[in-house]
């Protein structure tokens, strides 16, 4: 924030506190504005008041947002930790609060003035009910020749709101004249940019009180940290004669942890610094660069570790193979590849890396193919098992159908058998009856024949055997006929 604007804001706050507060409030705000930040103990010591008297003053100014507080726990040396309260002013908040208060006061007076600007003719002195002249005519009491209030039956009096409105208008004009400096300051502030005055910024502007203060005046001090005291460090030579070179600023810087770093560079220094940064970045990029065989797949594309049946000429591999073939380490015959250039160590290392990587990818491809084959075999086995289960289910269903058909046929056969048995039984019964009748007739015929042949048998005893044979033959014939 610029110096003129800073003075305007401070003068505005002083004018407001003197015009609307007065008394001890002026001392509190002036002390905080002068020192930028004040601890509670230091403020009580400067004003020579106790905490009971200071509490209401701080509460009123805080409620009106003219001052702000900051609490933090500090660790003094060789003592217990304490919680200290610091008071400072947040300029944007205070300016907004002043704008709002001025607007409320002016608006309240204008609303009251507009409400009573038109007199209504008559009013009740008791309930303050107002009536127009036409309404008052209806409330006329002929016995008393007075206008009576419809609510409390009291005589109405003439409304003198015109005089009161004039007084209120004069009061509003006097108020506007009194707050005109505030309005002018607010207009100037609105045309400028006000920075946020945080606790850290307020510490940077600190003017320490001239007493034996126990407050650290630091932001978030840690346990065991060294507290800065005035005179601990010498002033910088290049700051003499400036706003930061005065005694108060040096003491404020000594009592706060805020530091200022100044770095003066030229265009050539910036170019050199930029080139150095670019070189360092390029070196880091080279170190972190991904190898070529990681960017693209080399399976089937390079000579070493390729999966196809083609062979590529490699002098190193061929030479080692020839050495293994010649046990006596005899020099091998010269071939066409001996005329080629000798490979450098870097190229050989790259080829070895490519070969290793290709072998790895080849093994990985074989492993993947093996896994795919195993998966296909497992899928085929599962399909075969499913087909076998389906066939077993079909066989079971067919067996059940055949069993059902056999049971049905057996039931039908039993029915037919029962019917046939019944018919056979009946036929056997009829045959038995017929056979019995035939036997009866045969016995009767035999008896009759025996009766007829009885006398002759007695008369001719010698011929008995022949006659008996003839009779038996005849009976057999007759029996057969029957």
Curated annotation (Swiss-Prot):
Gene this protein is translated from: TFA1
Entry's family note: Belongs to the TFIIE alpha subunit family.
Domain of life: Eukaryota
Gene Ontology terms describing biological process: transcription by RNA polymerase II; transcription initiation at RNA polymerase II promoter; transcription open complex formation at RNA polymerase II promoter
Transmembrane annotation, as ranges: none
Phylogenetic lineage: Eukaryota, Fungi, Dikarya, Ascomycota, Saccharomycotina
Signal sequence segment: none
Pfam families: TFIIE_alpha (PF02002)
Comp. bias (Polar residues): 321-345, 419-432
Keywords of the record: Metal-binding, Nucleus, Transcription, Transcription regulation, Zinc, Zinc-finger
UniProt GO molecular function: RNA polymerase II complex binding; zinc ion binding
Compositionally biased tracts (Basic and acidic residues): 274-286, 433-444
One annotated Gene Ontology cellular component of this protein: mitochondrion
First-listed, main subcellular location of the protein, grouped into a coarse class: nucleus
Main function: Recruits TFIIH to the initiation complex and stimulates the RNA polymerase II C-terminal domain kinase and DNA-dependent ATPase activities of TFIIH. Both TFIIH and TFIIE are required for promoter clearance by RNA polymerase.
Assembly behavior: TFIIE is a tetramer of two alpha (TFA1) and two beta (TFA2) subunits.
Domain HTH TFE/IIEalpha-type, chain residue ranges per copy: 9-99
Name of the featured protein: Transcription initiation factor IIE subunit alpha
Miscellaneous comment in the UniProt entry for this protein: Present with 35900 molecules/cell in log phase SD medium.
Ranges of biased composition (kind: Acidic residues): 374-401, 464-482
